[in-house]
């Protein structure tokens, strides 16, 4: 399903801009106003549901923390499992981690080693098909690390989906999976 101009406006207008947050010169895109707007949230989720119905997915993986919101709603609508991609040290079972670069240092994300089935395979024995989702892609470091994690445990990241993309940062470059962004922000 292609997002209509009207639907795009409904979603975009529900996202609040917070100037100079978290530091001067940054305009933060606040999705809490999208989440508490039933029409905008439903419009967004209807679009994503229609887009991914034919993908024959096994799981949705949501990036900590806002990816959990959109990912769990979409997983429920598609009748597939949901897997949280967490910051290091937040999961209780055996995990696999992936390091990524920050402006000044490194961070890590992790998933349970059996998050997508034994050796990343679903009940048919084939590699689990996973959609990665988050609210925003800026530089892409966290998302690329999450996509690498999915592949590292033997599953297949079929696409990475973002509600918003800061297009001027060229974040899709070097991504191991196709990338879809609902809204491209310049």
From Swiss-Prot:
It catalyses: AMP + diphosphate = 5-phospho-alpha-D-ribose 1-diphosphate + adenine. GO terms for biological process: adenine salvage; AMP salvage; purine ribonucleoside salvage. Transmembrane segments: none annotated. InterPro entries: Ade_phspho_trans (IPR005764), PRibTrfase_dom (IPR000836), PRTase-like (IPR029057), UPRTase/APRTase (IPR050054). One of its GO terms (molecular function) is adenine phosphoribosyltransferase activity. Its main location: cytoplasm. Signal peptide: none annotated. Pathway: Purine metabolism; AMP biosynthesis via salvage pathway; AMP from adenine: step 1/1. It is found in: Cytoplasm. Catalyzes a salvage reaction resulting in the formation of AMP, that is energically less costly than de novo synthesis. Belongs to the purine/pyrimidine phosphoribosyltransferase family. HAMAP family: Aden_phosphoribosyltr. Homodimer. This is Adenine phosphoribosyltransferase. The lineage of its organism: Bacteria, Pseudomonadati, Campylobacterota, Epsilonproteobacteria, Campylobacterales.
